[in-house]
Amino acid sequence: MLRSRRRVPHLHLIAKGLSCSYSSSLHHATHLRPNTPQQLQQQLLKQLVSLLQKHSSSRQATQQVHSHFITSGFLHSQQSTSYILLLVNTLLRCYSLGQFPLEALLLYKNLNYLSFDSFTYTFLLHTCANLHSIFSGLQLHALVVKVGFQSQVYVQTALVYAYAVCGSLVEAMHVFDEMPKRNTVTWNVMISGLAKWGHLQLSHSLFDQMPTRTVVSWTAIIDGYTRMNRPDEALSLFRRMAIYEGIKPSEISLLAIFPAISIVGALKICQSVHTYGEKRGFNISNIRITNSLIDSYAKCGCIKSASRLFEDTSAQRKNLVSWTSIISSFAMHGMGKEAMERFEKMEEVGMKPNRVTFLSLLNACSHGGLVEEGLKFLNKMLNSYQIVPDIKHYGCLIDMLGRAGRLEEAEKMALGIPVEILNVVIWRTLLGACSFHNNVEMGERVTSKILEMEREYGGDYVLMSNIFAGVGMFGDAERLRKLMDKRNIFKVPGHSLV
């Protein structure tokens, strides 16, 4: 009894550095007054479980409870085994769903002498999914069969999920087909997994066979069509769900359909979804909905609605994606000045830009002919925010310089791009600028660079041939055409929309 009570003050240590509510709960745990050592142990274990459930997203809280659990001697107790297992499972769940899932497997390995239940293996399989570790998933599958939990529906569903996430769809379907009883979650996991990996026909077939379709089921199949760049089918399913089936789209449903709306430029649907989101309170409760609406309005050609929605959103709700979305919106509409103004306001409110923000800014400068401003943003990106440009940033800069006729600067920049990220698109961008400005000398140098990297694309030969022809060098143009024939390189035929 004395030994058990001496361990209670350890809880004061793990309270340090945590939130007030967490510390208060721990303080309460240290002042429990049970009648027996077993009751003390059970109440402490229950309190630790409660703390984990309240702070499941905190790695610090999880690790500190984990540490106390190990050092307290609970593991060597022959009593309160059900409470010990509950705490272990809660720890596994926190680790499996958090940012450090590997720690769940390490915890299980260190405690493999305990008698686990089906929930243990469910959480471990979610860990494998989070780690994208098919090898660990296969090992756990074998272990599940060995310990006799292979017929538990939650374990089977977790197996389907782990296999589907890892792309092992044959194994996922095998487990799914062997299940005598499937719940809605199992169906949704299988449909979503198949759709995610591009097996839309099979996914849709399962969707049609599903006994009861929920909003999650509809969202999974809609998201699949959107991901596979089939927006018309996605929009058709969305209408069918909302209008004909009478199922109210969730926030996730809206996030799944926005890319399809943007691809086809369906402004009326965008407006309808906006109105629906307002009625359901999604636009206020979820900033991702607002950000997606801003982006969709801009891609549907309505920059006025995108700008109005951004301005109507309170400063407290706006995040980095909100600012980047409106900057990108102005950029795609050629409104470079407005994009830069939003960037200045963004800095004023203390929001730190990322590489996507700068990419949008450089895009705006390129399409707006704002070369000096673009170069200043490059300098700010490098020196003020220590962001290293990637190939997309370089592509924007070379396009910007090329449009402005500053070809020597563009070539110098292209030659300075690190070899490990340089690709042929950079040189093709510069070749396009050479063609526009009839710069034969540089065009030849750039074409030589392109052919060192890739010889099979006919468009490069044609473009250089056109440069020659544009300045009256018809012999050189003909020579390049003959070289195409000699190398059996074909020009991709164009087509008219008329």
Stretches found by the model and what they are:
Residues 1-183, 192-197, 201-214, 223-498:
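Terminal (and in a subset, N-terminal) low-complexity or junction segments at the ends
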